[in-house]
Amino acid sequence: MNYLPIFIDLKSKNVLVIGAGEVGLNKIRILLRAKAKVNVIAKELCSEVKLLLRDQKINWLSKNFDLIYLNKIFLVVSATNDIKLNQYIFKKCNERCVLVNIVDDKLKCSFIFPSIIDRSPLIVAISSGGTAPVLLRLLREKIEAILPNKLGDVAKIAGKWRLAIKKHFSNFLERRKFWEKLFHSIFVEHILNGNKEQAINVLKKNMNQNISLTGEIILVGAGPGDSGLLTLRGLQVLQQADVVLYDYLVSEDILDLIRRDAKRICVGKRVGLKNITQNEIIKLLIFFAQKGKKVVRLKGGDPFIFGRGSEEIEAAKDAGIHFQVVPGITSAIGIAAYTGIPLTHRKYSQGVIFITGHKCIDGFLNNWSILSDPSYTLVVYMGTLKAVYIAQKLITFGRSKLTPIAIIVQGTTIHQKVIVGCLGEIEKIIPFAATPSLLIIGDVVHLHKKLAWFQSENILKKIKNKFSTLTFI
Protein backbone atom coordinates (compact mmCIF):
# COMPACT_ATOMS: atom_id res chain seq x y z
CA MET A 1 0.00 0.00 0.00
CA ASN A 2 1.76 3.14 -1.24
CA TYR A 3 -0.73 5.56 0.33
CA LEU A 4 -2.72 5.38 3.55
CA PRO A 5 -6.33 6.35 2.82
CA ILE A 6 -7.46 8.72 5.57
CA PHE A 7 -10.24 11.28 5.91
CA ILE A 8 -9.20 14.74 7.12
CA ASP A 9 -11.50 17.26 8.79
CA LEU A 10 -10.84 20.54 6.94
CA LYS A 11 -13.73 22.52 8.41
CA SER A 12 -12.55 26.11 9.06
CA LYS A 13 -8.91 25.16 8.38
CA ASN A 14 -6.78 27.44 6.21
CA VAL A 15 -5.71 25.84 2.94
CA LEU A 16 -3.75 27.40 0.10
CA VAL A 17 -4.29 26.88 -3.63
CA ILE A 18 -1.65 28.27 -5.98
CA GLY A 19 -3.02 28.72 -9.46
CA ALA A 20 -6.59 29.61 -10.42
CA GLY A 21 -7.07 28.13 -13.87
CA GLU A 22 -9.35 25.20 -14.67
CA VAL A 23 -7.24 22.70 -12.69
CA GLY A 24 -7.00 25.02 -9.70
CA LEU A 25 -10.77 25.60 -9.88
CA ASN A 26 -11.44 21.86 -9.59
CA LYS A 27 -9.29 21.63 -6.44
CA ILE A 28 -10.91 24.77 -4.98
CA ARG A 29 -14.36 23.25 -5.45
CA ILE A 30 -13.36 20.04 -3.65
CA LEU A 31 -11.85 21.98 -0.75
CA LEU A 32 -14.93 24.20 -0.45
CA ARG A 33 -17.14 21.11 -0.30
CA ALA A 34 -15.01 20.05 2.68
CA LYS A 35 -15.79 23.48 4.27
CA ALA A 36 -12.15 24.59 4.27
CA LYS A 37 -11.08 28.26 4.28
CA VAL A 38 -9.63 28.52 0.78
CA ASN A 39 -6.86 31.04 0.12
CA VAL A 40 -5.67 31.57 -3.45
CA ILE A 41 -2.45 32.83 -4.99
CA ALA A 42 -2.60 33.38 -8.75
CA LYS A 43 -1.57 35.95 -11.31
CA GLU A 44 -5.02 35.70 -12.88
CA LEU A 45 -8.35 34.20 -11.84
CA CYS A 46 -10.52 32.31 -14.29
CA SER A 47 -14.10 33.55 -14.57
CA GLU A 48 -15.57 30.96 -12.20
CA VAL A 49 -12.94 31.61 -9.54
CA LYS A 50 -13.77 35.33 -9.85
CA LEU A 51 -17.40 34.47 -9.04
CA LEU A 52 -16.27 32.57 -5.93
CA LEU A 53 -14.22 35.61 -4.91
CA ARG A 54 -17.19 37.92 -5.51
CA ASP A 55 -19.38 35.70 -3.32
CA GLN A 56 -16.68 35.79 -0.61
CA LYS A 57 -16.20 32.02 -0.71
CA ILE A 58 -12.44 32.33 -1.21
CA ASN A 59 -9.68 34.75 -0.27
CA TRP A 60 -7.28 36.03 -2.96
CA LEU A 61 -4.01 36.64 -1.15
CA SER A 62 -1.64 37.72 -3.88
CA LYS A 63 -0.52 37.35 -7.47
CA ASN A 64 2.87 35.96 -6.44
CA PHE A 65 3.89 33.24 -3.99
CA ASP A 66 5.87 34.14 -0.89
CA LEU A 67 6.93 31.97 2.05
CA ILE A 68 4.95 34.18 4.41
CA TYR A 69 1.77 32.73 2.93
CA LEU A 70 2.62 29.27 4.33
CA ASN A 71 2.16 30.53 7.89
CA LYS A 72 -0.78 28.84 9.62
CA ILE A 73 -1.63 26.87 6.47
CA PHE A 74 -2.77 23.28 6.99
CA LEU A 75 -2.62 22.08 3.40
CA VAL A 76 -1.26 23.35 0.06
CA VAL A 77 -2.23 22.57 -3.54
CA SER A 78 -0.09 23.89 -6.36
CA ALA A 79 -1.87 23.91 -9.73
CA THR A 80 0.63 25.84 -11.82
CA ASN A 81 2.74 24.83 -14.82
CA ASP A 82 5.82 26.52 -13.35
CA ILE A 83 8.17 23.59 -12.66
CA LYS A 84 10.69 25.60 -10.62
CA LEU A 85 7.98 27.19 -8.51
CA ASN A 86 6.35 23.81 -7.88
CA GLN A 87 9.69 22.34 -6.80
CA TYR A 88 10.25 25.27 -4.44
CA ILE A 89 6.76 25.00 -2.93
CA PHE A 90 7.15 21.25 -2.42
CA LYS A 91 10.50 21.70 -0.67
CA LYS A 92 9.32 24.48 1.64
CA CYS A 93 6.11 22.67 2.58
CA ASN A 94 8.06 19.55 3.49
CA GLU A 95 10.40 21.61 5.66
CA ARG A 96 7.37 22.93 7.55
CA CYS A 97 5.55 19.55 7.67
CA VAL A 98 2.69 21.04 5.67
CA LEU A 99 0.69 18.65 3.50
CA VAL A 100 1.30 19.47 -0.16
CA ASN A 101 -0.03 18.31 -3.51
CA ILE A 102 1.70 19.35 -6.73
CA VAL A 103 -0.96 18.57 -9.33
CA ASP A 104 0.04 15.89 -11.88
CA ASP A 105 3.41 15.26 -10.22
CA LYS A 106 2.92 12.46 -7.68
CA LEU A 107 6.62 12.44 -6.78
CA LYS A 108 6.08 15.90 -5.33
CA CYS A 109 3.00 15.08 -3.30
CA SER A 110 2.76 14.25 0.39
CA PHE A 111 -0.92 13.51 -0.27
CA ILE A 112 -3.05 12.84 -3.33
CA PHE A 113 -6.71 13.44 -4.09
CA PRO A 114 -8.77 10.28 -4.50
CA SER A 115 -11.73 9.85 -6.79
CA ILE A 116 -14.78 10.59 -4.63
CA ILE A 117 -18.27 9.11 -4.59
CA ASP A 118 -20.23 11.53 -2.43
CA ARG A 119 -23.32 10.35 -0.61
CA SER A 120 -22.68 12.61 2.36
CA PRO A 121 -22.21 11.81 5.13
CA LEU A 122 -21.31 8.54 3.42
CA ILE A 123 -18.13 9.05 1.39
CA VAL A 124 -16.34 6.49 -0.78
CA ALA A 125 -12.83 7.36 -1.95
CA ILE A 126 -10.80 5.26 -4.39
CA SER A 127 -7.35 5.77 -5.86
CA SER A 128 -4.87 4.11 -8.18
CA GLY A 129 -2.02 6.16 -6.73
CA GLY A 130 -1.80 8.05 -9.99
CA THR A 131 -1.01 4.92 -12.01
CA ALA A 132 -4.26 4.25 -13.90
CA PRO A 133 -6.66 7.23 -14.08
CA VAL A 134 -8.85 5.66 -16.79
CA LEU A 135 -9.29 2.47 -14.76
CA LEU A 136 -10.10 4.63 -11.75
CA ARG A 137 -12.80 6.46 -13.71
CA LEU A 138 -14.38 3.18 -14.80
CA LEU A 139 -14.40 1.89 -11.21
CA ARG A 140 -15.97 5.10 -10.00
CA GLU A 141 -18.73 4.77 -12.59
CA LYS A 142 -19.48 1.23 -11.39
CA ILE A 143 -19.59 2.28 -7.73
CA GLU A 144 -21.73 5.34 -8.54
CA ALA A 145 -24.23 3.01 -10.21
CA ILE A 146 -24.33 0.66 -7.22
CA LEU A 147 -24.87 3.25 -4.47
CA PRO A 148 -28.34 4.87 -4.44
CA ASN A 149 -28.39 8.68 -4.39
CA LYS A 150 -30.35 8.76 -1.12
CA LEU A 151 -28.00 6.40 0.70
CA GLY A 152 -26.64 9.39 2.59
CA ASP A 153 -30.09 9.88 4.14
CA VAL A 154 -29.81 6.39 5.63
CA ALA A 155 -26.54 7.38 7.31
CA LYS A 156 -27.99 10.70 8.51
CA ILE A 157 -30.98 9.07 10.21
CA ALA A 158 -28.74 6.40 11.75
CA GLY A 159 -26.47 9.18 13.04
CA LYS A 160 -29.37 11.01 14.68
CA TRP A 161 -30.44 7.85 16.50
CA ARG A 162 -26.97 6.61 17.38
CA LEU A 163 -26.87 8.07 20.90
CA ALA A 164 -30.39 6.82 21.70
CA ILE A 165 -29.45 3.32 20.53
CA LYS A 166 -26.27 3.44 22.61
CA LYS A 167 -28.30 4.28 25.72
CA HIS A 168 -30.91 1.63 24.95
CA PHE A 169 -28.40 -1.17 24.29
CA SER A 170 -25.53 -0.90 26.76
CA ASN A 171 -23.77 -3.97 25.37
CA PHE A 172 -21.58 -3.34 22.31
CA LEU A 173 -22.49 -6.68 20.72
CA GLU A 174 -26.19 -5.93 21.14
CA ARG A 175 -25.75 -2.57 19.41
CA ARG A 176 -23.84 -4.05 16.52
CA LYS A 177 -26.41 -6.78 15.99
CA PHE A 178 -29.20 -4.19 16.19
CA TRP A 179 -27.66 -2.10 13.43
CA GLU A 180 -26.87 -5.14 11.28
CA LYS A 181 -30.45 -6.34 11.53
CA LEU A 182 -31.84 -2.85 10.88
CA PHE A 183 -29.73 -2.23 7.78
CA HIS A 184 -30.81 -5.60 6.38
CA SER A 185 -34.48 -4.75 6.94
CA ILE A 186 -37.06 -2.68 5.05
CA PHE A 187 -35.76 0.35 7.01
CA VAL A 188 -33.31 1.19 4.21
CA GLU A 189 -35.86 0.71 1.44
CA HIS A 190 -38.31 3.07 3.14
CA ILE A 191 -35.68 5.84 3.24
CA LEU A 192 -34.63 5.31 -0.37
CA ASN A 193 -38.29 5.60 -1.35
CA GLY A 194 -38.68 8.84 0.61
CA ASN A 195 -40.77 7.26 3.41
CA LYS A 196 -38.67 8.47 6.35
CA GLU A 197 -41.55 8.33 8.83
CA GLN A 198 -42.15 4.65 8.08
CA ALA A 199 -38.42 4.02 8.38
CA ILE A 200 -38.38 5.57 11.87
CA ASN A 201 -41.29 3.33 12.86
CA VAL A 202 -39.28 0.28 11.76
CA LEU A 203 -36.31 1.51 13.80
CA LYS A 204 -38.43 2.00 16.94
CA LYS A 205 -40.03 -1.41 16.51
CA ASN A 206 -36.61 -3.06 16.28
CA MET A 207 -35.48 -1.22 19.42
CA ASN A 208 -38.24 -2.90 21.38
CA GLN A 209 -37.25 -6.39 20.25
CA ASN A 210 -34.84 -8.51 22.22
CA ILE A 211 -31.38 -8.88 20.69
CA SER A 212 -30.15 -12.44 20.86
CA LEU A 213 -26.52 -12.77 21.90
CA THR A 214 -26.41 -16.47 21.13
CA GLY A 215 -23.03 -17.30 19.65
CA GLU A 216 -22.36 -19.60 16.76
CA ILE A 217 -19.48 -21.39 15.08
CA ILE A 218 -19.10 -21.27 11.31
CA LEU A 219 -16.63 -23.41 9.41
CA VAL A 220 -15.49 -21.63 6.26
CA GLY A 221 -13.42 -23.11 3.46
CA ALA A 222 -10.93 -20.50 2.24
CA GLY A 223 -10.14 -22.36 -0.96
CA PRO A 224 -6.68 -23.32 -2.24
CA GLY A 225 -4.99 -19.91 -2.11
CA ASP A 226 -6.24 -17.45 -4.72
CA SER A 227 -8.57 -15.04 -2.88
CA GLY A 228 -10.78 -14.95 -5.98
CA LEU A 229 -11.71 -18.57 -5.28
CA LEU A 230 -13.27 -17.75 -1.90
CA THR A 231 -17.02 -18.23 -2.19
CA LEU A 232 -19.42 -15.30 -1.96
CA ARG A 233 -20.99 -16.86 1.14
CA GLY A 234 -17.54 -17.23 2.69
CA LEU A 235 -16.84 -13.53 2.11
CA GLN A 236 -20.17 -12.55 3.69
CA VAL A 237 -19.41 -14.60 6.80
CA LEU A 238 -15.90 -13.13 7.16
CA GLN A 239 -17.42 -9.65 7.04
CA GLN A 240 -19.76 -10.53 9.93
CA ALA A 241 -17.33 -12.42 12.17
CA ASP A 242 -16.42 -11.35 15.70
CA VAL A 243 -13.56 -13.85 15.99
CA VAL A 244 -11.66 -15.72 13.26
CA LEU A 245 -9.46 -18.73 14.00
CA TYR A 246 -7.45 -19.40 10.85
CA ASP A 247 -4.87 -21.83 9.51
CA TYR A 248 -1.45 -20.53 8.54
CA LEU A 249 -2.05 -21.74 4.96
CA VAL A 250 -4.79 -19.14 4.49
CA SER A 251 -3.38 -16.37 2.28
CA GLU A 252 -2.91 -12.77 3.42
CA ASP A 253 -5.24 -11.64 0.61
CA ILE A 254 -8.06 -13.64 2.19
CA LEU A 255 -7.19 -12.52 5.72
CA ASP A 256 -7.48 -8.92 4.49
CA LEU A 257 -11.15 -9.61 3.74
CA ILE A 258 -11.95 -10.21 7.42
CA ARG A 259 -13.92 -7.49 9.18
CA ARG A 260 -11.34 -4.99 10.45
CA ASP A 261 -12.35 -5.05 14.12
CA ALA A 262 -12.68 -8.84 14.32
CA LYS A 263 -10.25 -10.70 16.58
CA ARG A 264 -7.87 -12.84 14.50
CA ILE A 265 -6.10 -15.87 15.96
CA CYS A 266 -3.70 -18.07 13.99
CA VAL A 267 -4.13 -21.71 15.01
CA GLY A 268 -2.27 -23.28 12.10
CA LYS A 269 0.05 -26.22 12.50
CA ARG A 270 3.57 -26.21 11.06
CA VAL A 271 6.08 -29.03 10.95
CA GLY A 272 8.92 -28.61 13.44
CA LEU A 273 7.24 -25.87 15.47
CA LYS A 274 5.28 -25.92 18.71
CA ASN A 275 1.66 -25.90 17.64
CA ILE A 276 -1.67 -25.35 19.29
CA THR A 277 -3.44 -28.69 19.76
CA GLN A 278 -6.77 -29.61 18.23
CA ASN A 279 -8.34 -29.77 21.69
CA GLU A 280 -7.12 -26.23 22.38
CA ILE A 281 -8.62 -25.04 19.09
CA ILE A 282 -11.96 -26.58 20.00
CA LYS A 283 -11.85 -24.99 23.45
CA LEU A 284 -11.24 -21.57 21.89
CA LEU A 285 -14.15 -22.01 19.46
CA ILE A 286 -16.53 -22.93 22.26
CA PHE A 287 -15.18 -20.25 24.63
CA PHE A 288 -15.87 -17.39 22.22
CA ALA A 289 -19.19 -18.80 21.00
CA GLN A 290 -20.46 -19.12 24.58
CA LYS A 291 -19.72 -15.41 25.01
CA GLY A 292 -22.21 -14.67 22.24
CA LYS A 293 -19.61 -14.21 19.51
CA LYS A 294 -19.92 -15.20 15.87
CA VAL A 295 -16.83 -17.40 15.55
CA VAL A 296 -15.41 -18.35 12.17
CA ARG A 297 -13.05 -21.29 11.79
CA LEU A 298 -11.27 -20.42 8.54
CA LYS A 299 -9.58 -23.41 6.95
CA GLY A 300 -7.60 -23.81 3.75
CA GLY A 301 -9.39 -25.61 0.94
CA ASP A 302 -12.60 -27.26 2.09
CA PRO A 303 -13.21 -27.80 5.83
CA PHE A 304 -14.37 -31.39 5.33
CA ILE A 305 -11.42 -32.58 3.22
CA PHE A 306 -8.57 -33.57 5.57
CA GLY A 307 -9.43 -30.55 7.69
CA ARG A 308 -10.80 -32.01 10.95
CA GLY A 309 -13.80 -29.78 10.46
CA SER A 310 -16.18 -32.53 11.48
CA GLU A 311 -14.48 -32.82 14.88
CA GLU A 312 -14.96 -29.09 15.47
CA ILE A 313 -18.67 -29.03 14.67
CA GLU A 314 -19.20 -32.25 16.64
CA ALA A 315 -17.82 -30.38 19.64
CA ALA A 316 -20.14 -27.45 18.87
CA LYS A 317 -23.10 -29.83 18.69
CA ASP A 318 -22.16 -31.45 22.00
CA ALA A 319 -21.88 -28.00 23.61
CA GLY A 320 -25.30 -26.96 22.30
CA ILE A 321 -23.84 -24.24 20.07
CA HIS A 322 -25.42 -23.42 16.73
CA PHE A 323 -23.10 -24.11 13.79
CA GLN A 324 -22.99 -24.03 10.02
CA VAL A 325 -20.54 -24.98 7.30
CA VAL A 326 -19.52 -22.91 4.27
CA PRO A 327 -17.77 -25.24 1.82
CA GLY A 328 -14.69 -24.19 -0.10
CA ILE A 329 -12.91 -25.29 -3.25
CA THR A 330 -10.69 -28.10 -2.04
CA SER A 331 -7.01 -27.82 -2.89
CA ALA A 332 -6.97 -30.83 -5.22
CA ILE A 333 -9.73 -29.41 -7.41
CA GLY A 334 -8.46 -25.82 -7.47
CA ILE A 335 -4.77 -26.58 -7.91
CA ALA A 336 -5.35 -29.21 -10.59
CA ALA A 337 -7.42 -26.69 -12.54
CA TYR A 338 -4.72 -24.01 -12.22
CA THR A 339 -2.05 -26.40 -13.50
CA GLY A 340 -4.07 -27.67 -16.46
CA ILE A 341 -4.32 -31.20 -15.08
CA PRO A 342 -7.85 -32.65 -15.30
CA LEU A 343 -8.22 -35.16 -12.49
CA THR A 344 -10.44 -37.37 -14.63
CA HIS A 345 -10.25 -37.88 -18.39
CA ARG A 346 -11.93 -40.32 -20.77
CA LYS A 347 -8.57 -41.43 -22.14
CA TYR A 348 -6.39 -41.37 -19.03
CA SER A 349 -8.43 -41.71 -15.83
CA GLN A 350 -11.84 -43.05 -14.87
CA GLY A 351 -11.72 -41.75 -11.30
CA VAL A 352 -9.74 -39.89 -8.67
CA ILE A 353 -8.65 -40.79 -5.14
CA PHE A 354 -7.65 -38.29 -2.44
CA ILE A 355 -5.30 -39.33 0.38
CA THR A 356 -3.13 -37.48 2.89
CA GLY A 357 0.58 -38.14 3.19
CA HIS A 358 0.47 -37.81 6.97
CA LYS A 359 -1.25 -41.19 7.30
CA CYS A 360 0.83 -43.20 4.81
CA ILE A 361 2.11 -45.80 7.26
CA ASP A 362 1.59 -49.57 7.23
CA GLY A 363 -1.43 -50.66 9.18
CA PHE A 364 -3.32 -47.41 8.63
CA LEU A 365 -3.26 -46.98 4.85
CA ASN A 366 -3.23 -50.57 3.63
CA ASN A 367 -5.18 -50.42 0.36
CA TRP A 368 -2.13 -50.00 -1.86
CA SER A 369 -3.49 -52.35 -4.52
CA ILE A 370 -6.37 -49.93 -5.10
CA LEU A 371 -4.14 -46.85 -4.95
CA SER A 372 -1.81 -48.42 -7.51
CA ASP A 373 -4.56 -48.91 -10.11
CA PRO A 374 -3.34 -46.94 -13.20
CA SER A 375 -6.92 -46.18 -14.25
CA TYR A 376 -7.26 -43.79 -11.27
CA THR A 377 -5.61 -40.46 -10.56
CA LEU A 378 -4.08 -40.31 -7.10
CA VAL A 379 -3.89 -36.95 -5.32
CA VAL A 380 -1.81 -36.73 -2.15
CA TYR A 381 -2.35 -33.85 0.25
CA MET A 382 0.61 -32.93 2.47
CA GLY A 383 2.64 -35.58 0.67
CA THR A 384 6.12 -34.06 0.43
CA LEU A 385 7.65 -35.73 3.47
CA LYS A 386 6.22 -39.17 2.59
CA ALA A 387 6.54 -38.86 -1.20
CA VAL A 388 9.42 -41.34 -1.58
CA TYR A 389 7.67 -43.89 0.65
CA ILE A 390 4.41 -43.50 -1.30
CA ALA A 391 6.20 -43.92 -4.64
CA GLN A 392 7.97 -47.06 -3.45
CA LYS A 393 4.70 -48.58 -2.26
CA LEU A 394 2.88 -47.75 -5.50
CA ILE A 395 5.68 -49.26 -7.60
CA THR A 396 5.79 -52.35 -5.38
CA PHE A 397 2.06 -52.86 -5.95
CA GLY A 398 2.36 -52.54 -9.72
CA ARG A 399 2.30 -48.87 -10.67
CA SER A 400 4.77 -48.14 -13.49
CA LYS A 401 7.95 -46.24 -12.67
CA LEU A 402 7.20 -44.11 -15.74
CA THR A 403 3.87 -42.93 -14.32
CA PRO A 404 3.91 -39.12 -14.66
CA ILE A 405 3.71 -37.07 -11.49
CA ALA A 406 3.29 -33.39 -10.71
CA ILE A 407 4.26 -31.67 -7.48
CA ILE A 408 2.65 -28.26 -7.07
CA VAL A 409 3.85 -25.72 -4.52
CA GLN A 410 1.72 -22.69 -3.52
CA GLY A 411 -0.89 -23.65 -6.06
CA THR A 412 -3.35 -21.07 -7.50
CA THR A 413 -1.18 -18.18 -6.28
CA ILE A 414 1.22 -15.94 -8.21
CA HIS A 415 4.02 -17.97 -6.58
CA GLN A 416 2.77 -21.28 -7.99
CA LYS A 417 5.56 -23.70 -8.92
CA VAL A 418 5.12 -26.99 -10.77
CA ILE A 419 7.56 -29.90 -10.80
CA VAL A 420 6.78 -32.57 -13.39
CA GLY A 421 8.57 -35.90 -13.52
CA CYS A 422 8.22 -39.68 -13.22
CA LEU A 423 7.21 -41.80 -10.25
CA GLY A 424 10.52 -43.70 -10.40
CA GLU A 425 12.54 -40.50 -10.08
CA ILE A 426 10.65 -38.94 -7.23
CA GLU A 427 13.60 -39.34 -4.87
CA LYS A 428 15.61 -36.98 -7.11
CA ILE A 429 12.74 -34.56 -7.62
CA ILE A 430 11.37 -34.15 -4.11
CA PRO A 431 14.31 -32.11 -2.69
CA PHE A 432 13.27 -29.29 -5.03
CA ALA A 433 9.73 -29.19 -3.62
CA ALA A 434 8.90 -26.97 -0.66
CA THR A 435 6.29 -27.87 1.91
CA PRO A 436 3.37 -27.93 1.88
CA SER A 437 2.70 -29.14 -1.63
CA LEU A 438 0.17 -31.21 -3.54
CA LEU A 439 1.19 -34.39 -5.36
CA ILE A 440 -0.76 -35.58 -8.42
CA ILE A 441 0.06 -39.07 -9.73
CA GLY A 442 -1.38 -40.47 -12.94
CA ASP A 443 -1.47 -40.31 -16.71
CA VAL A 444 -3.56 -37.11 -16.62
CA VAL A 445 -0.31 -35.27 -15.85
CA HIS A 446 0.56 -35.83 -19.54
CA LEU A 447 -1.91 -33.00 -20.26
CA HIS A 448 -0.16 -30.41 -18.10
CA LYS A 449 2.10 -29.06 -20.85
CA LYS A 450 -0.78 -28.74 -23.31
CA LEU A 451 -3.47 -27.39 -20.97
CA ALA A 452 -1.50 -25.24 -18.51
CA TRP A 453 -2.99 -21.73 -18.65
CA PHE A 454 -2.03 -20.12 -15.35
CA GLN A 455 1.49 -18.73 -15.37
CA SER A 456 3.70 -20.72 -13.04
CA GLU A 457 7.34 -21.68 -12.77
CA ASN A 458 8.38 -25.16 -13.87
CA ILE A 459 11.30 -25.83 -11.56
CA LEU A 460 12.61 -28.73 -13.64
CA LYS A 461 13.43 -26.43 -16.54
CA LYS A 462 16.41 -25.40 -14.42
CA ILE A 463 17.51 -28.94 -13.56
CA LYS A 464 16.25 -31.00 -16.51
CA ASN A 465 19.72 -32.34 -17.36
CA LYS A 466 19.67 -34.36 -14.13
CA PHE A 467 16.80 -36.56 -15.34
CA SER A 468 16.67 -39.20 -18.04
CA THR A 469 12.98 -40.02 -18.48
CA LEU A 470 11.31 -36.62 -18.72
CA THR A 471 10.26 -37.08 -22.34
CA PHE A 472 6.66 -36.06 -21.61
CA ILE A 473 7.48 -32.60 -20.21
Swiss-Prot record:
The record's annotation in Pfam families points to: CysG_dimeriser, NAD_binding_7, TP_methylase
List the keywords (alphabetical).
Cobalamin biosynthesis, Lyase, Methyltransferase, Multifunctional enzyme, NAD, Oxidoreductase, Phosphoprotein, Porphyrin biosynthesis, S-adenosyl-L-methionine, Transferase
Question: Which residues are recorded with the post-translational modification Phosphoserine?
Answer: 128
Q: Where is this region: Uroporphyrinogen-III C-methyltransferase?
A: 215-473
InterPro entries reported for this sequence: 4pyrrol_Mease, 4pyrrol_Methylase_sf, 4pyrrole_Mease_sub1, 4pyrrole_Mease_sub2, CobA/CysG_C, NAD(P)-bd_dom_sf, Siro_Cobalamin_biosynth, Sirohaem_synt_dimer_dom_sf
EC numbers, comma separated: 2.1.1.107, 1.3.1.76, 4.99.1.4
Reaction(s) catalysed (UniProt annotation): uroporphyrinogen III + 2 S-adenosyl-L-methionine = precorrin-2 + 2 S-adenosyl-L-homocysteine + H(+); precorrin-2 + NAD(+) = sirohydrochlorin + NADH + 2 H(+); siroheme + 2 H(+) = sirohydrochlorin + Fe(2+)
Where, in this chain's numbering, is NAD(+) bound? 22-23, 43-44
Q: Which domain of life is it from?
A: Bacteria
Could you tell me which pathway this protein works in?
Cofactor biosynthesis; adenosylcobalamin biosynthesis; precorrin-2 from uroporphyrinogen III: step 1/1; Cofactor biosynthesis; adenosylcobalamin biosynthesis; sirohydrochlorin from precorrin-2: step 1/1; Porphyrin-containing compound metabolism; siroheme biosynthesis; precorrin-2 from uroporphyrinogen III: step 1/1; Porphyrin-containing compound metabolism; siroheme biosynthesis; siroheme from sirohydrochlorin: step 1/1
A Gene Ontology molecular function term for this protein is: uroporphyrin-III C-methyltransferase activity
Query: Which BP terms in the Gene Ontology apply to this protein?
Result: cobalamin biosynthetic process; methylation; siroheme biosynthetic process
Q: NCBIfam families from the entry? A: cobA_cysG_Cterm, cysG_Nterm, PRK06136.1, PRK10637.1
The function of this protein is: Then it catalyzes the NAD-dependent ring dehydrogenation of precorrin-2 to yield sirohydrochlorin. Finally, it catalyzes the ferrochelation of sirohydrochlorin to yield siroheme.
The protein here is known as: Siroheme synthase
